Amino acid sequence: EISCSLVGSEMCIRDRMDKKLDKQMEAAAIAAGTEDEEEKFSFKDVKNILVNPGFWLIALLCVLFYSCVFPFQKFASELMIIKYGINENVAGTFAGLPALGALILTPVFGGFIDKRGKSASIMLLGSAMLICVHFIYAIPDINYWLVAIVLMIILGIAFSLVPSAMWPAVAKIFPVSQLGTAYALIFFIQNIGLWGIPTLIGWVLDAYCISGKKPDGTNMYDYTVPMCIFTGIACLSLIVALLLKKADKKYGYKLEEPNIQK
């Protein structure tokens, strides 16, 4: 249920970005006087995208960020039950707070970025928040239930901040004619990560983290090592976000400028 909620939140975010992209493409086509001409796929566009440093930074940030959220949510409820002693009847509700936060806050943050900009800085902030969340979850002695809930709320804020800044940033890095291809390549790389990281975490849990058996005979796990892995991935996302901000200054992507120019 939690994964479905997160996917639903992500679909809402991408739907908003799709509508914005459609308007941008229509405006660009009218300005160029080519609104009636059909855009054709070109392998040259793929080459141009792949040699653009901004593509790899956005793609890496995307895969690292989402790899810290979606795979974690698969066992968030059990983490709350086992480590924090939260009742299993409400653990799923608390674990679903990031999805609820994304639904409410993404339009708010998106509106701020449209008017004020600061996309690169917001991606930095969201990545730093991820580090804090997973690092505190990884500390064995911090097991008070209220801490777990506060961390879920912070995760929800981060899950709203980064996508609301990251997806519109793609439209600043690439010309309109390359946007569809760029998004497709980014989603392709993202899906590789969303396959690989859960596979890694599942292997680590079964190999090193079994702490006992439940009454029904299934395994109980100590999630310290997986949370350390997520913390490491979040640290990598922060490094990539820093590099993206540096690239923004070097290549003039204008990520810090508002999306809507007056």
Predicted regions and their residues:
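A membrane-interface helix-boundary motif in multi-pass transporters
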Residues: 203-234
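Multi-pass alpha-helical transporter architecture, strongest
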Residues: 14, 223-262
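Extracytoplasmic gate region of multi-pass secondary transporters
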Residues: 52-103, 163, 167, 197-198
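Juxtamembrane intracellular "pre-TM" segments in multi-pass secondary transporters
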Residues: 20-58, 260-262
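Helix-to-loop junctions at the C-terminal end of transmembrane segments
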Residues: 105-118, 205
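C-terminal transmembrane helical hairpin of 12-TM major facilitator-type secondary transporters
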Residues: 119-166
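Single conserved hydrophobic/aromatic residue that forms the stacking wall/gate
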Residues: 1-8, 13
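A late C-terminal transmembrane helix in Major Facilitator Superfamily
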Residues: 173-210
